[in-house]
Amino acid sequence: MKFHLVLLLAIVPLTLARHPHGKFNRHASYDDREKHRGYRKENDYLNYDLKGKFSRTRQAYLHGSFDKYGNENERGRYDDQGKYSLAGKSAHDGKYGMYGNMYAKGDFKAYGNEDEGAKFEEVTTFRRGGGYDSYGKKKSYDDYDTKGHLKKFANKGRQSKFDMYGNVKADGQAISNGNMNATVCLTPMANTISMAK
């Protein structure tokens, strides 16, 4: 009996260790209930083949003559040859799976107050006067002076409380295989000959 108990205690942790799993527990208070379940499966396959070839050949010839009397003798030759090839193959296989559960309960409370107002004050001063100058002419004046003040005030307050507790569990598995081969060959050749007299 003890042997079976020891064997059971050894096999169960090994089985759990081979499969990825996780568990997250958190306590709070939240009056709204929400339940979500989801399952996702995705297969991805990609095959890619690339083949290419490039070759070129160039030739140039130059003849001429020039000396101190106005004659120039020049001969030249230019050869350029090149070859470029590219071949490749790429393959990718993938498989993805996801399954999860989410359960949540909670409570949300909020309290707030807001006060806002404005105050405007205006004061006007009026003066009138007059008199005579040295030539006997009468002068009079009127003077207005207006001042205004605008005051705004506001008061805002808010208090909220959010509590939540729930359990989240997720299991996943991913398998990916890939293979890539590439071959590049570049062979440049150049020959330049220049002769002058």
UniProtKB/Swiss-Prot annotation:
Keywords noted in UniProt: Signal
InterPro entries registered for this protein in UniProt: TES
Origin: domain of life: Eukaryota
Position of the signal peptide: 1-17
Name recorded for this polypeptide: Putative eggshell protein
Native source species: Fasciola hepatica (Liver fluke)
Organism phylogeny: Eukaryota, Metazoa, Spiralia, Lophotrochozoa, Platyhelminthes
